[in-house]
Amino acid sequence: MLTLTHYLVLAAVMFAISVLGIFLNRKNVIVLLMAIELMLLAVNFNFIAFAHYFGDTAGQIFVFFVLTVAAAESAIGLAILVVLFRNLATINVEDLGQLKG
């Protein structure tokens, strides 16, 4: 039987992997977006684990709101990525400094 601690350790490992992915990869925008999404999924995993452990549905409902915001963030991030690739022909984060408004 899996306890709450198992779920929290798994979520902490997922969160640590995503933070490590953000710090180690500073070049590719797609990998950065994937790491941020993994971070949000780890937080959602914690919400679901606590909601199941305490028998409350508020955590599960809050996950739907977080997933909605994450989907919007992904859509906006990918739209910005397409515009960057059209203008600069690259998706490197280092080249974002060339954008002038």
Curated annotation (Swiss-Prot):
Its main location: membrane. It is found in: Cell inner membrane. It is a multi-pass membrane protein. Its EC number is 7.1.1.-. One of its GO terms (cellular component) is plasma membrane. The chain crosses the membrane at residues 4-24, 30-50, 61-81. It is an enzyme of class 7 (translocase). NDH-1 is composed of 14 different subunits. Subunits NuoA, H, J, K, L, M, N constitute the membrane sector of the complex. Belongs to the complex I subunit 4L family. This is NADH-quinone oxidoreductase subunit K. It comes from Laribacter hongkongensis (strain HLHK9). The gene is nuoK.
